[in-house]
Structures are given as C-alpha cells and as structure tokens.
Amino acid sequence: MGNEFIASASISFIITLIGLTLGFALLKLQGE
C-alpha cells in the first residue's frame, strides 16, 4: 500500500514538473 502511494505521488510530481517546464518554455517562446 505504501509503495503504491509513493509511485502515484512521484508520477504526479513528474507530470507537474513536465507541465511547468512546458508552460515556461511556451511563455518564453511567446515573449520573443
């Protein structure tokens, strides 16, 4: 049960990190 929570937590963290990176890149591209 603990392993499943850790796995889902890291997956959602990675997805959030990717989303933030993509959003930041899009903002920089639009700013130019």
From Swiss-Prot:
Pfam families: PetM
Membrane-protein topology: Single-pass membrane protein
Primary location: plastid
Keyword annotations of the record: Chloroplast, Electron transport, Membrane, Photosynthesis, Plastid, Thylakoid, Transmembrane, Transmembrane helix, Transport
GO CC list: chloroplast thylakoid membrane; cytochrome b6f complex
InterPro entries documented for this protein: PetM_cyt_b6/f_cplx_su7
Superkingdom as given in the UniProt entry: Eukaryota
Protein name: Cytochrome b6-f complex subunit 7
